[in-house]
């Protein structure tokens, strides 16, 4: 059975730059989290998407330090922290970029 082709629009150079910028902003501003999306305004393609802090995909059940875990959490609390860690704020949070995005759109 023939399958369908999958084409991605991610640009590895833009992705790497966004990851570095997100980490830098996280540290400099002492933010709780940083999310970045770079999108092509002509067609809506996502060129980069970053959430920081990020977790190790090879160890998805190990809580990252930034989650505030100290190893004494109850099972329910640990599950809550894991769900929060796995969540992708770029696509699941209801906050919209709003006016901060208009500047970028205007520049294009």
Residue ranges and their predicted role:
Residues 55-59:
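Extended hydrophobic/aromatic segments used for targeting, binding, or gating
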Residues 43-47:
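Short glycine/threonine-rich beta-strand-turn micro-motifs
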Residues 2-42, 61-108:
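Active-site loop and adjoining helix of the penicillin-binding protein/serine DD-peptidase-beta-lactamase fold
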Residues 48-54:
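Short beta->alpha transition motifs characteristic of CBS
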């Amino acid at each position: 059975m023939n399958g369908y082709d999958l084409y991605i629009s991610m640009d590895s150079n833009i992705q790497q730059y966004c990851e570095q910028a997100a980490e830098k902003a996280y540290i400099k501003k002492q933010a709780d989290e940083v999310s970045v999306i770079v999108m092509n305004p002509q067609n809506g393609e996502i060129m980069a998407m970053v959430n920081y802090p990020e977790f190790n995909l090879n160890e998805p059940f190990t809580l990252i330090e930034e989650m505030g875990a100290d190893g004494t959490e109850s099972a329910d609390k640990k599950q809550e922290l894991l769900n929060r860690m796995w969540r992708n704020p770029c696509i699941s949070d209801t906050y919209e970029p709003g006016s901060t995005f208009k500047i970028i759109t205007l520049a294009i």
